[in-house]
Amino acid sequence: MEHQTTPKQKTKEKSKGNKTKFVGVRQRPSGKWVAEIKDTTQKIRMWLGTFETAEEAARAYDEAACLLRGSNTRTNFANHFPNNSQLSLKIRNLLHQKQSMKQQQQQQHKPVSSLTDCNINYISTATSLTTTTTTTTTTAIPLNNVYRPDSSVIGQPETEGLQLPYSWPLVSGFNHQIPLAQAGGETHGHLNDHYSTDQHLGLAEIERQISASLYAMNGANSYYDNMNAEYAIFDPTDPIWDLPSLSQLFCPT
């Protein structure tokens, strides 16, 4: 009695014949063998090609595994493979593309951080400029051969005495450091004295000179303030520097 095989048994026998002991190798329905390698660490899945025999496909897998994972990886054969084969060049190009894509992704995140750094630098620079502007004072510096005197030299007249801050000459014989209270007291005292007419006239002349000096000084202060507010520059060619002395104004010859 002959043993007859059913179609299911034939399919099982065929599938058992298709199974191989090689890693990364499988057979197509057409009968050819294909090799494929996966690397979850580097996120690579590479099609190695179609081969006539299972041994050729297994050797292609071994070569790709050694290039991707190193020589200690699991292989189908213990043989060493050349590094200049067409498959090795293909795998190296794939690795280079993966590294380039990774670098591009990292560079895409850099502009955001650089813009943030620029904004921080701009804010800190603006703050430092504001602080520098608020602490800046007027000083006497030469610029383009034009001397700009320090505005701090110009001050208000003292109340205790008539010590003028300017070097303008006054009338000869005039004591410009006489206190106002003393001058006023002497004035009232001499007004009550009918026998000191000459002294009264002398004090009146002194008071007139004091009034003229104060008027000239106040006018100069107003002029300096206007110059500081509008131009902040003292020009040596300005007519203010050519003013005649008070002795020439009040005692013309």
UniProtKB/Swiss-Prot annotation:
A GO term for molecular function: DNA-binding transcription factor activity
Keyword terms, alphabetized: Activator, DNA-binding, Ethylene signaling pathway, Nucleus, Transcription, Transcription regulation
InterPro entries, per database record: AP2/ERF_dom, AP2/ERF_dom_sf, AP2/ERF_ERF_subfamily, DNA-bd_dom_sf
Superkingdom of origin organism: Eukaryota
CDD domains reported for this sequence: AP2
Its job: Probably acts as a transcriptional activator. Binds to the GCC-box pathogenesis-related promoter element. May be involved in the regulation of gene expression by stress factors and by components of stress signal transduction pathways.
Name of the protein: Ethylene-responsive transcription factor RAP2-11
Organism: Arabidopsis thaliana
Gene label: RAP2-11
